[in-house]
Amino acid sequence: MKLAIIGIATLAGLFSIDQVAAADGKAVYDKSCGGCHNAMDPKLGDKAKWGPIAKRGTDALVATVIKGKGAMPPKGGTTLSNEDIKAAVEYMISKAK
């Protein structure tokens, strides 16, 4: 019984960590996107490059990231969830405003 309670508590803790990660676009960007987007176009915060991209809308950009485009492989070459991708896209767009 003690092991079952410990197991449930551990799983609950992991679940809450995943929820925080999904909601934190900056953390997702820093871990999974910045390696390329800090060095290559469109760079984070480049308003001239991101302006036209952002006009397509979040849903369209998330779909592009999931599918991949140009030099960017599907999901940026990561195993991110769609929710994490959306959070990162929203963060990147917010830095271009």
Question: Over which residues does each language-model region extend?
Answer:
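Post-cleavage N-terminal segment of exported redox proteins
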Residues: 1-23, 91-97
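Secondary-structure boundary/capping signal
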Residues: 5, 20-21, 33, 73, ...
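Electrostatic cytochrome c docking/interface patches
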Residues: 11-28, 40-51, 58
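The canonical Cys-X-X-Cys-His
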Residues: 30-39, 88
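Axial heme c-ligation environment in periplasmic c-type cytochrome domains
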Residues: 43-53, 63-97
